[in-house]
Design a protein with these regions (language model features):
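A ligand-binding cleft/hinge motif common to bilobed small-molecule-binding domains
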Residues: 91-96, 215-239
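Short beta-strand->loop
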Residues: 104-110, 119-122, 238-250, 259-260
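A bilobed periplasmic-binding-protein/Venus flytrap-type ligand-binding module shared by bacterial periplasmic
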Residues: 129-136, 178-180, 252-267, 283-284
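Mature extracytoplasmic/periplasmic domains
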Residues: 259-315
Length: 335
């Protein structure tokens, strides 16, 4: 009954702060409960939570899953003190929250790790890839080694019915972030959008939906997909190929911080310290561990998105309006 009551109180508070939780999960039965508000799929981080509570029978973890934009808005509205940790892959929104004073300081142990202003800790890296259905693309798949090659291939496709998908930057904070990073790295970004739109471009909210479309054959390719969401599907989808372009491969940091209203800073910091520990990292998928930077890579260099004030620039309303003015023109040009 205690857990049901706590769950009801937290979910009621979340709804009052503009959140529409995608799920609420509990790991462990200890009375010292740390509550995490995050964007990541619970199944992918549950092993880390399980390892944390196994170290002490007094500990438990409650995880509330929601979208990055709703989490950002809820933090700004003022979180209930029961929320101990905020985790998100929308690193630009996270950096802005810290800059605006919504975090608490990390421990000395954590400030030695990759962090921003001693308050935001990086605990995972998500490499970004392009996904293709080789049954639809055919032998050409081996030629798609770079974004330039992809653009040229799209130009050469005259047959009808070719479809593609990518994040919709209006729906997805991660999609907007990746679009901005592509613009910084690649002068051909808008040309790529032009060529995708010349066929049938279907912007999407989520990596999972994009992957489903490629697996089913509804889309021939998905641009800018989170790699760790793809790898569990490969054994059951032999037609699916991952492309790691040789020009660059973005990687999104997953980050966490202790919100300023949190009651139990010490327990929150214990959880964050476990996430970046060797034991915690070993419980994550190998594709997202911080050591992914050291792996042999079939494509170009992995370029992690750096924690810096530069991430905040494109969140300016004028900059957003300018981007979406061009996005609307280019993404709908041939549709």
């Amino acid at each position: 009954m205690r857990y049901l009551t706590a769950c009801f109180v937290l979910l009621t508070a979340a709804l009052a702060h503009g959140l529409t939780p995608e799920g609420s999960f509990v790991v462990g039965q200890g009375t010292q409960q740390v509550t995490v508000l995050g964007t990541g799929d619970f199944a992918r981080i549950q092993p880390v939570f399980a390892g944390f509570v196994q170290r002490s029978s007094d500990h438990s973890v409650r995880y509330i899953q929601a979208s990055s934009r709703e989490i950002d808005q809820a933090v700004r509205a003022g979180l209930p003190p029961e929320i101990d940790v905020v985790m998100s892959s929308a690193v630009d929104l996270q950096v802005r929250l810290i800059n605006d004073g919504f975090g608490q300081s990390l421990s000395d142990e954590l400030t030695n790790s990759t962090n921003w202003r001693g308050e935001l800790i990086q605990w995972a890296l998500e490499p970004i890839v392009t996904l293709v259905n080789s049954r639809l693309v055919g032998d050409d798949v081996d030629q798609l080694s770079s974004r330039s090659a992809l653009i040229q291939w799209l130009k050469n496709q005259e047959r009808s019915g070719l479809t593609a998908t990518l994040y919709d930057p209006r729906q997805s904070g991660v999609g907007y972030l990746l679009s901005q990073q592509d613009l910084l790295q690649d002068t051909q970004f808008w040309e790529l959008i032009d060529q995708l739109a010349r066929h049938q471009l279907r912007p999407n909210c989520c990596s999972g939906d994009m992957i489903d479309q490629v697996v089913s054959g509804e889309s021939a390719l998905a641009y800018n997909v989170i790699e760790s969401y793809v790898t569990p599907r490969l054994e059951r989808a032999p037609d699916i190929r991952i492309l790691r372009f040789n020009d660059y491969q973005l990687a999104i940091p997953r980050t966490g911080f202790v919100p300023r209203e949190a009651n139990d800073r010490d327990l929150a910091l214990d959880l964050l310290a476990y996430f970046v520990s060797d034991e915690g990292q070993a419980r994550l998928s190998p594709t997202v561990r911080l050591a992914v930077l050291n792996r042999p890579n079939a494509g170009g260099p992995i370029k992690p998105i750096r924690l810096s004030p530069a991430l905040i620039v494109h969140l300016d309303p004028v900059a957003r309006d300018d981007f979406f003015r061009v996005w609307d023109q280019r993404s709908q040009r041939a549709q």
